[in-house]
C-alpha cells in the first residue's frame, strides 16, 4: 500500500469514528472558552478557527467566549499602568477598564472573528454590552482572618459577575448560521462596564442556552489525580470529592467550579481540555479518546 493510500485510509478511519458523534451533536449548541496557549501559537490559532468552521459546517452550533489577560497586561505595561491582582482577579479601576474594553472588544475579539471568517466561517464579534448580552453586577469580594469579627469587603473596582444573558440575541445569530464570538465584558444596570472572568461568562452562557457542552481550553492536559494521571471522565460527585481531598486546588478551583455549576445548571457535560494540542476541540468531541477531562451529572453504577 502506498503512502498516499495509507494517508487516505487514515482519513477514512477518522471520518468513520467521527460520524456517530456528528450525528449526535447536529443542531446542538457547544460553548467554547478560548484562551491560554491556544491563542498564542499561529498553528494552534489556525487549528482552532478550522475546528470552529468545521463544526458549523456539519450542523453543530459553536458559541465562542474568549479571554485576553496577557494582551491586557501587555498594553497596561506599555502605558505604564500597574497591574494588581487580588485572589487571581485583576483590580480594575476606570483607567484599567478602558484598556480592558480596548483590548478585549477592539483587538482580541476582532482578531478571532477575522481568523474564523478567513477560514470560511461567518463569525460576528460581540461584547456583553451589545444588546445587553451579558448583564452584570459588581462582584463582592470579602476576606476574613481569625482575628476579625466580621469579613472585610475588598473593592476590586469594575470586576463583575453575570446576572443575566440575552439568549434571544444568541439564538437569532445561531439560527442565522452565524458564529457568535463574545468578549467577557458585562454591562450594569446604569450602563457601566464590568470586567468578568471569561470562564465564568462561558459557563453562564452555556447554562442560559442549555448547551450540550461547555468546553474550556486550558494549558494543562486535563484534571489529574495525585499520581499525575489524567482523569478522563468524572461525575460532579467525584469532582466534589477531589476538591475535598485536595487533589484539585489553587488556580484550577475557579475553572472547575465553573464547569461544575454549568453541569448542575443544565449543561449536559463540561470539558477541561488541553488547548496546547492541535485541533483539541475536534479531538475532544469527535473521537473516542478525547484530549482532556469530561464532567457530567450522571451517576456511575
UniProtKB/Swiss-Prot annotation:
It is an enzyme of class 2 (transferase). Its EC number is 2.7.2.8. It comes from Pseudomonas syringae pv. tomato (strain ATCC BAA-871 / DC3000). It is found in: Cytoplasm. Catalyzes the ATP-dependent phosphorylation of N-acetyl-L-glutamate. It catalyses: N-acetyl-L-glutamate + ATP = N-acetyl-L-glutamyl 5-phosphate + ADP. It holds the Pfam family AA_kinase. Substrate binds at residues 68-69, 90, 195. InterPro entries: AceGlu_kinase-like_sf (IPR036393), AcgluKinase_fam (IPR004662), ArgB (IPR037528), Asp/Glu/Uridylate_kinase (IPR001048), NAGK-C (IPR041727). Keywords: Amino-acid biosynthesis, Arginine biosynthesis, ATP-binding, Cytoplasm, Kinase, Nucleotide-binding, Transferase. This is Acetylglutamate kinase. One of its GO terms (molecular function) is acetylglutamate kinase activity. GO terms for cellular component: cytoplasm. The record marks 33, 255 as: Transition state stabilizer. Pathway: Amino-acid biosynthesis; L-arginine biosynthesis; N(2)-acetyl-L-ornithine from L-glutamate: step 2/4.
